C-alpha cells in the first residue's frame, strides 16, 4: 500500500489484481472481509478500468466460496460507488439463479445496491418455490439482507405486501415459522444453561471413576468423556486416574487418561506424566505436553529447550512452544527464534501454526526479550489476528520499529490500522 501511495501501480498492478480475483485471507470468517481494503487500492486509480473489467468478467463464474464472496463484495462496493457495469453484473448473476436451492448467492450484495425492491422480488420468487413444494428449504430473510437493511423493517414491509401477493405471503409465513423455531431454540439453550449443574451431577452419576477407568481400555470411548470427567472430578478421583496412569502401558489408554487432565489442574509435575511427554506415540506425547505446559518446573524448561533445538522441530510440533509459557528463562528467546527462522514456512498453514504458537508464547511470557519472536510473527504469519497480537506486544515493550509502525497504518487488518491511528 505504501508503494501504491508513493509510486502508483507501477510494478505491482498484476499482484494487486490477482489479490482481487482470489481471496488472500487465511480465514476470512475469523479475520473479516478484506474486500473494502482491496477496493481502496484501486478505487480511483488509472488502472481502475482494468480491475473493473476483470472483476465483472469473473462474477458470472463465481461460486459460493471465499473467492466468490470476495469478488461479489468487491463488485458490490464498486456498484455502490456508481459503477453500472458492476451493478448489472451482480443483478444478472442473482436473477439468473432458479431460487429453488437453499442458497441465493450474491443476494445481500444485490440488496445493498437495489434495496427493498430487490428483497420484494426475491421474496416473491422464493415464495413461489414454497407454494410449489411445501417441503422446500429456501434462503432465510436475514441472509438476503445481511446488514444492508433493518430486519424488522423489512419483515414489516413484506407482511404488508403479503395481503395482496400469495407468493410473498407464503415466504413470510415460512420465515415466521423459521424464526419461531429459532426463538424456541434460544429458550431451550437458556434452559440448558440454567440446568448445567443438574447435567453435571447426572454425568458424574453415569460416569463414576470406575466407569472412566474401564472406558480407558475401550476402543469406542470418546475423548469428550474423559475431558468432561476431568473438569468435574474431585481430587480423589484425579488421584486414582494418576495411579492408573502409572501402571498403564497401552498408548491409547494412556492418551485417554491424560485427557482427564485437559481441564483439570495438576498441582505438581507427576513423574509418570513427565515420562509420557517423551513417549514414542505422538498422540500420547502431545496429550502429556498439553497437561504439563500449564505447570512451572525446571525440567519443563529443559524439555522445551531440547524440543526447539531438535532438528525435527517443525510446524507439526509448534504446540511444543507452549512448554515455555510458564517456564521461560533468559536466553531461551535465542533458541526459539533460531528454531522459527530455520523453518521453510512455504505453506500458509505451516506459517500459521508456528505463528499462532509463537505469539501465544509472547502474550504468556510477556518478556521484552521476545521482541525478536514477535517480529518473526509479524513478518511471517499470514493471519492478521496473530500479527495484530504481535504488534500489540511490541508496543507494550516499546520495541516496535518505526518502519513497521508506518506499515501498520496501511495494514489489511481494520483492527491493526485502528490501533496504530490511536498512537501519536
Question: How would you describe each model-predicted region?
Answer:
Residues 367-371:
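N-terminal accessory targeting/assembly segments
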Residues 16, 21-22, 55-59, 89-91, ...:
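Buried hydrophobic core positions in alpha-solenoid tandem helical repeats
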Residues 205-211:
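Elongated scaffolding segments in large macromolecular assemblies
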Residues 329, 342-345:
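Short, catalytically relevant binding-site loops at active-site mouths
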Residues 237:
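Alpha-helix-centered segments that form part of catalytic cores
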Residues 1-11, 27-50, 68-81, 92-95, ...:
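Structural detector for internal amphipathic alpha-helices that build alpha-solenoid repeat scaffolds
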Residues 408-414:
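TPR/TPR-like (Sel1-like) alpha-helical repeat modules
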Amino acid at each position: 500500500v505504501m508503494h501504491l501511495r508513493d509510486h502508483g501501480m507501477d510494478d505491482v498492478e498484476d499482484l494487486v489484481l490477482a489479490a482481487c480475483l482470489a481471496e488472500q485471507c487465511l480465514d476470512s470468517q475469523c479475520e473479516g472481509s478484506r474486500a473494502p481494503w482491496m477496493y481502496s487500492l484501486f478505487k480511483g486509480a488509472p488502472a481502475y478500468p482494468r480491475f473493473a473489467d476483470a472483476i465483472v468478467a469473473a462474477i458470472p463464474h463465481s461460486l459460493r466460496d471465499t473467492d466468490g464472496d470476495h469478488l461479489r463484495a468487491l463488485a458490490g462496493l464498486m456498484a455502490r460507488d456508481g459503477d453500472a457495469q458492476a451493478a448489472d453484473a451482480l443483478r444478472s448473476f442473482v436473477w439468473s439463479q432458479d431460487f429453488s436451492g437453499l442458497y441465493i448467492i450474491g443476494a445481500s450484495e444485490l440488496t445493498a445496491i437495489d434495496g427493498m425492491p430487490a428483497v420484494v422480488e426475491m421474496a416473491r420468487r422464493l415464495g413461489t418455490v414454497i407454494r410449489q413444494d411445501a417441503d422446500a428449504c429456501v434462503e432465510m430473510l436475514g441472509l438476503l439482507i445481511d446488514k444492508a437493511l433493518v430486519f424488522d423493517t423489512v419483515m414489516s414491509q413484506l407482511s404488508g405486501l403479503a395481503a395482496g401477493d400469495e407468493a410473498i405471503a407464503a415466504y413470510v409465513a415460512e420465515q415466521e415459522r423459521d424464526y419461531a423455531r429459532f426463538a424456541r431454540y434460544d429458550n431451550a439453550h437458556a434452559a440448558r444453561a440454567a440446568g448445567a449443574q443438574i447435567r453435571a451431577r447426572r454425568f458424574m452419576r453415569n460416569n463414576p471413576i470406575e466407569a472412566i477407568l474401564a472406558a480407558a481400555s475401550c476402543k469406542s470411548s470418546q475423548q469428550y468423556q474423559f475431558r468432561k470427567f476431568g473438569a468435574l472430578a474431585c481430587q480423589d478421583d484425579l488421584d486414582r486416574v494418576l495411579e492408573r496412569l502409572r501402571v498403564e502401558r497401552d498408548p491409547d489408554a494412556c492418551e485417554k487418561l491424560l485427557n482427564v487432565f485437559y481441564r483439570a489442574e495438576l498441582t505438581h509435575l507427576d513423574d509418570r506424566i513427565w515420562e509420557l511427554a517423551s513417549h514414542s506415540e505422538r498422540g500420547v506425547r502431545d496429550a502429556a505436553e498439553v497437561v504439563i505446559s500449564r505447570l512451572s518446573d525446571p525440567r519443563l524448561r529443559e524439555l522445551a529447550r531440547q524440543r526447539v533445538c531438535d532438528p525435527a522441530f517443525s510446524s507439526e510440533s509448534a504446540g511444543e512452544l507452549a512448554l515455555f509459557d510458564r517456564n521461560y528463562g533468559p536466553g531461551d528467546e535465542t533458541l526459539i527464534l533460531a528454531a522459527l527462522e530455520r523453518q521453510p514456512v512455504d505453506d500458509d498453514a505451516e506459517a500459521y501454526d508456528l505463528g499462532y504458537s509463537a505469539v501465544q508464547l509472547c502474550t504468556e511470557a510477556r518478556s521484552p526479550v521476545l521482541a525478536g519472536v514477535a517480529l518473526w510473527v509479524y513478518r511471517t504469519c499470514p493471519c492478521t489476528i496473530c500479527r495484530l497480537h504481535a504488534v500489540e506486544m511490541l508496543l507494550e515493550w516499546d520495541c516496535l520499529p518505526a518502519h513497521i509502525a508506518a506499515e501498520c497504518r496501511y495494514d489489511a487488518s481494520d483492527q491493526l490500522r485502528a490501533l496504530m491511528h490511536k498512537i501519536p
